[in-house]
Amino acid sequence: MVEKAQLMDEKAIARAITRISHEIIERNKGVENLVLVGIKTRGVPIANRISKKIEQIEGTKVDTGDIDITLYRDDLEKIHVEPVVKGTYLDFNVNDKTVVLVDDVLYTGRTVRASLDAIIDIGRPKSIQLAVLVDRGHRELPIRADYVGKNVPTSRHEIISVSLLEIDGEDSVTIKE
Protein backbone atom coordinates (compact mmCIF):
# COMPACT_ATOMS: atom_id res chain seq x y z
CA MET A 1 0.00 0.00 0.00
CA VAL A 2 1.60 3.25 -1.17
CA GLU A 3 0.55 6.65 0.12
CA LYS A 4 -0.56 8.81 -2.82
CA ALA A 5 -1.34 12.05 -1.04
CA GLN A 6 -2.16 13.68 2.26
CA LEU A 7 -5.72 14.99 2.04
CA MET A 8 -6.01 16.61 5.46
CA ASP A 9 -3.49 17.64 8.08
CA GLU A 10 -4.07 18.53 11.73
CA LYS A 11 -5.33 22.04 10.90
CA ALA A 12 -7.68 20.84 8.15
CA ILE A 13 -9.17 18.21 10.48
CA ALA A 14 -9.65 20.83 13.21
CA ARG A 15 -11.38 23.17 10.72
CA ALA A 16 -13.66 20.34 9.56
CA ILE A 17 -14.60 19.50 13.17
CA THR A 18 -15.38 23.17 13.85
CA ARG A 19 -17.53 23.46 10.71
CA ILE A 20 -19.40 20.21 11.42
CA SER A 21 -20.05 21.40 14.99
CA HIS A 22 -21.51 24.70 13.78
CA GLU A 23 -23.65 22.89 11.18
CA ILE A 24 -25.04 20.51 13.82
CA ILE A 25 -25.97 23.44 16.06
CA GLU A 26 -27.56 25.40 13.20
CA ARG A 27 -29.54 22.50 11.73
CA ASN A 28 -30.90 21.49 15.14
CA LYS A 29 -31.51 25.08 16.30
CA GLY A 30 -29.31 24.50 19.32
CA VAL A 31 -28.34 21.36 21.20
CA GLU A 32 -31.41 20.58 23.29
CA ASN A 33 -32.14 16.82 23.26
CA LEU A 34 -29.06 16.23 21.09
CA VAL A 35 -26.65 13.35 21.73
CA LEU A 36 -23.51 12.26 19.88
CA VAL A 37 -22.63 8.61 19.33
CA GLY A 38 -19.22 7.71 17.93
CA ILE A 39 -18.91 4.51 15.91
CA LYS A 40 -15.90 2.54 17.14
CA THR A 41 -13.07 2.93 16.58
CA ARG A 42 -12.18 6.29 15.02
CA GLY A 43 -15.68 7.74 15.20
CA VAL A 44 -15.33 7.92 18.99
CA PRO A 45 -12.55 10.55 19.22
CA ILE A 46 -14.20 12.53 16.42
CA ALA A 47 -17.49 12.54 18.38
CA ASN A 48 -15.60 13.65 21.50
CA ARG A 49 -13.95 16.50 19.58
CA ILE A 50 -17.30 17.63 18.16
CA SER A 51 -18.77 17.50 21.67
CA LYS A 52 -15.97 19.68 23.06
CA LYS A 53 -16.32 22.15 20.19
CA ILE A 54 -20.11 22.38 20.66
CA GLU A 55 -19.57 22.99 24.37
CA GLN A 56 -17.13 25.82 23.53
CA ILE A 57 -19.64 27.38 21.14
CA GLU A 58 -22.89 26.85 23.06
CA GLY A 59 -21.67 26.64 26.66
CA THR A 60 -23.68 23.42 27.01
CA LYS A 61 -22.31 19.91 27.41
CA VAL A 62 -23.70 17.39 24.91
CA ASP A 63 -24.01 13.76 26.00
CA THR A 64 -21.53 11.64 24.06
CA GLY A 65 -21.16 7.88 23.89
CA ASP A 66 -19.83 5.17 21.66
CA ILE A 67 -21.25 2.15 19.93
CA ASP A 68 -19.69 -1.11 18.83
CA ILE A 69 -21.37 -2.54 15.74
CA THR A 70 -19.37 -5.78 15.53
CA LEU A 71 -22.34 -8.08 16.10
CA TYR A 72 -24.54 -6.06 13.71
CA ARG A 73 -22.21 -6.44 10.72
CA ASP A 74 -23.61 -8.22 7.68
CA ASP A 75 -20.23 -9.77 6.79
CA LEU A 76 -19.50 -11.77 9.95
CA GLU A 77 -19.83 -15.08 8.13
CA LYS A 78 -17.36 -13.89 5.48
CA ILE A 79 -14.49 -12.97 7.80
CA HIS A 80 -14.18 -16.48 9.34
CA VAL A 81 -12.83 -15.30 12.68
CA GLU A 82 -14.43 -14.79 16.04
CA PRO A 83 -15.52 -11.16 16.27
CA VAL A 84 -13.92 -9.06 19.00
CA VAL A 85 -16.69 -7.09 20.67
CA LYS A 86 -15.41 -3.84 22.15
CA GLY A 87 -18.61 -2.85 23.94
CA THR A 88 -21.05 -0.01 23.70
CA TYR A 89 -20.92 2.89 26.13
CA LEU A 90 -24.02 5.07 26.32
CA ASP A 91 -24.76 6.46 29.77
CA PHE A 92 -27.85 8.25 28.50
CA ASN A 93 -31.22 7.37 27.03
CA VAL A 94 -31.67 7.82 23.27
CA ASN A 95 -35.48 7.83 23.38
CA ASP A 96 -36.93 11.00 21.81
CA LYS A 97 -33.42 12.41 21.29
CA THR A 98 -31.74 13.57 18.12
CA VAL A 99 -28.85 11.14 17.77
CA VAL A 100 -25.88 12.21 15.66
CA LEU A 101 -23.88 9.15 14.63
CA VAL A 102 -20.23 10.03 14.03
CA ASP A 103 -17.71 8.07 11.96
CA ASP A 104 -14.41 8.72 10.24
CA VAL A 105 -15.11 7.54 6.67
CA LEU A 106 -18.38 6.92 4.82
CA TYR A 107 -17.89 4.37 2.04
CA THR A 108 -20.44 1.64 1.23
CA GLY A 109 -22.88 2.60 3.99
CA ARG A 110 -22.78 -0.84 5.62
CA THR A 111 -21.17 0.38 8.86
CA VAL A 112 -23.84 3.07 9.16
CA ARG A 113 -26.60 0.52 8.51
CA ALA A 114 -25.23 -1.67 11.31
CA SER A 115 -25.04 1.40 13.58
CA LEU A 116 -28.66 2.26 12.86
CA ASP A 117 -29.68 -1.28 13.86
CA ALA A 118 -27.65 -1.03 17.08
CA ILE A 119 -29.13 2.37 18.03
CA ILE A 120 -32.70 1.25 17.34
CA ASP A 121 -32.13 -1.84 19.51
CA ILE A 122 -31.19 0.51 22.37
CA GLY A 123 -34.15 2.88 22.06
CA ARG A 124 -36.38 4.97 19.84
CA PRO A 125 -34.71 8.26 18.92
CA LYS A 126 -36.67 11.21 17.56
CA SER A 127 -34.24 11.28 14.63
CA ILE A 128 -30.82 10.01 13.62
CA GLN A 129 -28.31 12.13 11.72
CA LEU A 130 -24.86 11.22 10.39
CA ALA A 131 -21.60 13.15 10.62
CA VAL A 132 -18.43 11.89 8.91
CA LEU A 133 -14.96 13.32 8.55
CA VAL A 134 -14.59 11.96 4.99
CA ASP A 135 -17.18 10.85 2.42
CA ARG A 136 -15.47 8.83 -0.31
CA GLY A 137 -18.53 7.73 -2.29
CA HIS A 138 -19.28 4.23 -3.66
CA ARG A 139 -22.45 3.67 -1.65
CA GLU A 140 -24.04 0.22 -1.72
CA LEU A 141 -26.99 1.31 0.43
CA PRO A 142 -29.23 4.40 0.27
CA ILE A 143 -27.36 6.25 3.02
CA ARG A 144 -25.95 9.78 3.00
CA ALA A 145 -24.21 11.94 5.56
CA ASP A 146 -25.87 15.05 6.96
CA TYR A 147 -22.51 16.58 7.88
CA VAL A 148 -19.28 15.99 5.94
CA GLY A 149 -15.80 17.27 6.72
CA LYS A 150 -14.45 16.56 3.23
CA ASN A 151 -15.82 14.86 0.11
CA VAL A 152 -13.12 12.79 -1.59
CA PRO A 153 -14.07 11.00 -4.81
CA THR A 154 -12.06 7.78 -4.95
CA SER A 155 -11.73 4.66 -7.02
CA ARG A 156 -12.72 1.38 -5.37
CA HIS A 157 -9.09 0.22 -5.13
CA GLU A 158 -7.96 3.33 -3.25
CA ILE A 159 -8.04 3.45 0.54
CA ILE A 160 -8.71 6.46 2.75
CA SER A 161 -6.63 6.23 5.93
CA VAL A 162 -7.61 8.39 8.90
CA SER A 163 -5.09 8.81 11.71
CA LEU A 164 -6.16 10.50 14.92
CA LEU A 165 -3.98 11.76 17.76
CA GLU A 166 -5.94 9.83 20.40
CA ILE A 167 -5.36 6.48 18.66
CA ASP A 168 -2.48 6.88 16.22
CA GLY A 169 -0.40 9.69 17.73
CA GLU A 170 -1.07 12.15 14.87
CA ASP A 171 -3.91 13.76 12.93
CA SER A 172 -3.99 13.15 9.18
CA VAL A 173 -6.10 11.81 6.35
CA THR A 174 -4.25 10.16 3.49
CA ILE A 175 -5.20 8.32 0.33
CA LYS A 176 -3.36 5.10 -0.43
CA GLU A 177 -3.25 2.79 -3.41
From Swiss-Prot:
Keywords attached to this entry: Glycosyltransferase, RNA-binding, Transcription, Transcription regulation, Transcription termination, Transferase
GO biological process, one term: DNA-templated transcription termination
Enzyme class: transferase
InterPro entries listed in its UniProt record: PRibTrfase_dom, PRTase-like, PyrR, PyrR_bifunctional
CDD domains in alphabetical order: PRTases_typeI (cd06223)
Pfam family, one: Pribosyltran
Transmembrane segments: none
EC number: 2.4.2.9
Catalytic activity: UMP + diphosphate = 5-phospho-alpha-D-ribose 1-diphosphate + uracil
Chain positions of motif PRPP-binding: 99-111
Keyword Transmembrane helix: no
GO MF terms, alphabetically ordered: RNA binding; uracil phosphoribosyltransferase activity
Family from the record: Belongs to the purine/pyrimidine phosphoribosyltransferase family. PyrR subfamily.
Complex formation: Homodimer and homohexamer; in equilibrium.
Function of the molecule: Regulates transcriptional attenuation of the pyrimidine nucleotide (pyr) operon by binding in a uridine-dependent manner to specific sites on pyr mRNA. This disrupts an antiterminator hairpin in the RNA and favors formation of a downstream transcription terminator, leading to a reduced expression of downstream genes.
Name of the protein this chain belongs to: Bifunctional protein PyrR
